[in-house]
Amino acid sequence: MGKRIGLFGGTFDPVHIGHMRSAVEMAEQFALDELRLLPNARPPHRDAPQVSAAQRLAMVERAVAGVERLTVDARELLRDKPSYTIDTLESVRAELAADDQLFMLIGWDAFCGLPTWHRWEALLEHCHIIVLQRPDADSEPPEALRDLLAARSVADPRALKGPGGQITFVWQTPLAVSATQIRALLGNGRSVRFLVPDAVLNYIEAHHLYRAPH
């Protein structure tokens, strides 16, 4: 049996307990050997985060330290060119054995935007896609994805076979925590204790991150 590896990308600006809880739940539900938190470089379609890539990475490293099965993959931050998901998947897949299963976790909103991604139709050549659906999400995928879903969608997440090529949906009620909310609290000099892991809080405070300029 090959290994089961998950990738969970995000800007993690900062990483918070909502990210961590989703990661732990998915690692358990899919019996993953490893779930890699993958801090995104400034994606070509996203604004630049206000904290440096090295600082975002340091926070994720502290968040996963000592947490079974959770690791960090920094490859997107180490590239010196625009960072596309397809490049990451090709790079990760090249390091795995042929029978290893690779799972990419993405949220519903990101999934609906998939047709705008660079070489998006090639993503499934390298991995399975697990879409995390929130109860409050719109339930209709865009037209551009309907043929793909008809051909590749699997109702039972446990039925994903082979190294990649299929899509499944998992209902998840995320914790009501957002990085935007955390940045706003910190900018107003408020506490974010219990919204981020303690080690992340310590790092934020030590480096005075997200504080409003005086």
Curated annotation (Swiss-Prot):
Catalytic activity: nicotinate beta-D-ribonucleotide + ATP + H(+) = deamido-NAD(+) + diphosphate
Pfam family, one: CTP_transf_like
Keyword set, alphabetical order: ATP-binding, NAD, Nucleotide-binding, Nucleotidyltransferase, Pyridine nucleotide biosynthesis, Transferase
GO BP field: NAD biosynthetic process
EC category name: transferase
Lipid biosynthesis in keyword set: no
Pathway named in the protein's UniProt entry: Cofactor biosynthesis; NAD(+) biosynthesis; deamido-NAD(+) from nicotinate D-ribonucleotide: step 1/1
EC number, as in UniProt: 2.7.7.18
Gene3D superfamilies, A to Z: HUPs
Nuclease recorded as keyword: no
MF term (GO), any: nicotinate-nucleotide adenylyltransferase activity
InterPro entries to which the protein is assigned, alphabetical: Cyt_trans-like, NadD/NMNAT, Rossmann-like_a/b/a_fold
Source domain of life: Bacteria
Record function comment: Catalyzes the reversible adenylation of nicotinate mononucleotide (NaMN) to nicotinic acid adenine dinucleotide (NaAD).
Family stated for the protein in its record: Belongs to the NadD family.
The protein's name in its UniProt record: Probable nicotinate-nucleotide adenylyltransferase
The species this protein was found in: Pseudomonas paraeruginosa (strain DSM 24068 / PA7)
Taxonomic lineage from the root: Bacteria, Pseudomonadati, Pseudomonadota, Gammaproteobacteria, Pseudomonadales
Gene name of this polypeptide: nadD
